[in-house]
Amino acid sequence: MKCGFFHTPYNLPTRTARQMFDWSLKLAQVCDEAGFADFMIGEHSTLAWENIPCPEIIIGAAAPLTKNIRFAPMAHLLPYHNPATLAIQIGWLSQILEGRYFLGVAPGGHHTDAILHGFEGIGPLQEQMFESLELMEKIWAREPFMEKGKFFQAGFPGPDTMPEYDVEIADNSPWGGRESMEVAVTGLTKNSSSLKWAGERNYSPISFFGGHEVMRSHYDTWAAAMQSKGFTPERSRFRVTRDIFIADTDAEAKKRAKASGLGKSWEHYLFPIYKKFNLFPGIIADAGLDIDPSQVDMDFLAEHVWLCGSPETVKGKIERMMERSGGCGQIVVCSHDNIDNPEPYFESLQRLASEVLPKVRMG
């Protein structure tokens, strides 16, 4: 099983842009040295707790500081970008990383980002994402076209575009060609329509964990959509995000986790989000408890939501998750702000990669 890292980034709102930039590069280096496969970076323009508006800058800066880890924006919010500009930037950046780049796409799920870009809400965004990506795919194909869609317009020049003199067109398509670049899509709710759309296009799925039943539905939805279009689904492509904290003992891990950026993120930011999207019922059901979501506290999180404990305990929790949900190919650790006390966090990441995942029984 591989491990990945999702740098949302869940930062304290008081952090400066420079602090977040430096912290992001350090995390990328730590994950690369620990043997993580992927490093994914969120994109938001208005969220103080998730404040990285341009993940491509971090990807470009981290490229020469790392050796093996792959990078992805997770995700570029396509309705907020010019598709022609973004297609060229993505292709060029993938060439810089020479195979260590993949692409995440999404419509955008936060109303404040939508308002910033002139939309009253997020309702129309999915249709715009579809149109944007279709135009980007045509640009990467490097065949002449000119198209004005409902929301965007784009084209690609051909030999007859400027007949009075010869123009050599730069090849800013993805490294190794479009077919070599993985595209990934995230899913949050049960039977996610986003993952159905991803499966129909042979894009990879990333499941935001909301309980074993939701996780299973994410894979099943994606796999059924893949098969409906003649593709073969593989569990090795299925990624699942989890909050993870590892220490010598269960007690020490829980103590460190609750005092860390993980605890702060949940206490001040993620509790309302999980309640808004009704994600707690599935997790409570997994725990076998009869409690109301309003009763969920930090101790419940440490025991039932986070993969928290000694290496052996976390290994067991991952194996139970795999057994109950059907399994996945990559565990993706969610990022949290540990700028003020990074060493316990770095230790946890390193132990996950070296002591836990290599020993997980895949069933």
Curated annotation (Swiss-Prot):
Involved in the degradation and assimilation of (+)-camphor, which allows P.putida strain NCIMB 10007 to grow on this enantiomer of camphor as the sole carbon source. Catalyzes the FMNH(2)-dependent lactonization of 2,5-diketocamphane via a Baeyer-Villiger oxidation to produce the unstable lactone 5-oxo-1,2-campholide with (R,R) configuration, that presumably undergoes spontaneous hydrolysis to form 2-oxo-Delta(3)-4,5,5-trimethylcyclopentenylacetate. Is also able to convert (+)-camphor and norcamphor to the corresponding lactone in vitro. The lineage of its organism: Bacteria, Pseudomonadati, Pseudomonadota, Gammaproteobacteria, Pseudomonadales. Induction: By both (-)-camphor and (+)-camphor enantiomers. Optimum pH is 7.5. Belongs to the bacterial luciferase oxidoreductase family. One of its GO terms (molecular function) is 2,5-diketocamphane 1,2-monooxygenase. It catalyses: (1R,4R)-bornane-2,5-dione + FMNH2 + O2 = (1R,4R)-5-oxo-1,2-campholide + FMN + H2O + H(+). InterPro entries: Bact_Lucif_Oxidored, Luciferase-like_dom, Luciferase-like_sf. Pathway: Terpene metabolism; (R)-camphor degradation. GO terms for biological process: (+)-camphor catabolic process. It holds the Pfam family Bac_luciferase. Its EC number is 1.14.14.108. Homodimer. Likely forms a loose transient complex with a P.putida flavin reductase that provides the required FMNH(2) to the enzyme. Keywords: Flavoprotein, FMN, Monooxygenase, Oxidoreductase, Plasmid. FMN binds at residues 74, 186-194. This is 2,5-diketocamphane 1,2-monooxygenase 1. It is an enzyme of class 1 (oxidoreductase). GO terms for cellular component: cytosol.
